Amino acid sequence: MAIKTSTSRKIFVIFNYTFLAILALICIFPFIHLLALSFSSDEFTSKGLVSVYPMGFTLDAYMILATKPEFFKAFGISVARTILGTSLALLVIILTAYPLSKSNKVLKGRTAIAWIFVFTMFFGGTLASQYVLYRMLGLLDNFLVYILPGACDVWFVLMLMNFFRGIPKEIEEAALIDGCNHFQILFRIFVPISVPVIVTIILFTAVGQWNSWFDGIFFMSDTTSYPLQSYLYVMLESSDPAKLAQNGTLTPQQIEQLKNLGSKNLQAAQIFLGMLPITLVYPFLQKYFIKGITIGSVKG
């Protein structure tokens, strides 16, 4: 039997879909505009004529980027820090959240330890103290400065801890009776059950690692060791085609290509390539992301 829908309900649904469609277009427009700029010639971008489709279509911006090895080196550094940093952070977060999910009877002083973690969320060190600490630890001008400082995010520890606490104790007790130790319980039972939350942590951590520019600027003196975002931060101020033509590293054909380019074209191409990897990965993890946020926030 068909369910009748009232007129007010239909209007409400139409309004919701219209509103969400407009909101989606507002979110997508910057990406489309950026892509259009990267494929347009300076004749049109300099006059502000490019909106959602390229004008004076050209691939010169991407051809010029292909001749800049420092761009691809920075890209590789960002890929390495994202993979290694996310992997280490996930391992540390899991190994920290599991014991904190136990009661005070199992882990003596568990409450005090948890409050120490929470304290660090509200009272962090200043930039000067961070710099001094990293210098003492030998992290300045060291690739590890991209990985170690973010290896234990307290927010994610608390999120995963709350999820672990929501897992029925009977499951753990049955595993202990069967002869499992805590590492086996953690990685064979708790981790598989917690996939939605873990994928959420992976996504947040990977995005944070990929988008980080601050540590490269302040803790690396060698610009060739910059990750992509730090490199873009510097290059966006010096991507004038005239400067590139004067550095003597381009061929006559590439210099000819620069005549059709402006700084906006190169900037748009670099930014678009920089955000592309995360943009491509996110849709595949979206279902876990939404579920993980919801479950991780209410468990326990």
Task: Label the model's feature ranges.
Residues A2-G300:
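A hydrophobic, multi-pass inner-membrane permease signature
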